[in-house]
């Protein structure tokens, strides 16, 4: 172990980020990559597809989703992105814009408030707005 590093110093220098997990929930690696405007290639686990292709938003594609353990598909995605700097830049911008719109504290607070309000309503529990 040579000491701690600040990942922000390195992410922005990368052409792409690759997540080849076989299990994930909400991978922070993707959000960290988007903060640095870096596109992501990720396996189809957890919410990777939603983060990369979007969920009810118009930000555009921010990377590629590949099948788990499909080495040929992962390699193809890497070579496709490596060969097209303009596409990587657009995807990085799309990811950054998605992150800024959907993962700010204010947006997350609003989303959780709506979830709890709807749950309280479904249980016939009164809800006072915070």
Language-model features, listed with the residues they occupy:
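Active-site donor-binding acidic/aromatic loop of nucleotide-activated sugar
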Residues: 1-4, 10
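Aromatic "clamp/platform" in nucleotide-sugar-dependent glycosyltransferases that forms part
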Residues: 22
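A short, well-ordered alpha-helix in the C-terminal region of glycosyltransferases
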Residues: 73, 80, 87-101, 111-114, ...
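Short hydrophobic beta-strand element within catalytic cores of glycosyltransferases
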Residues: 39-42, 47, 52
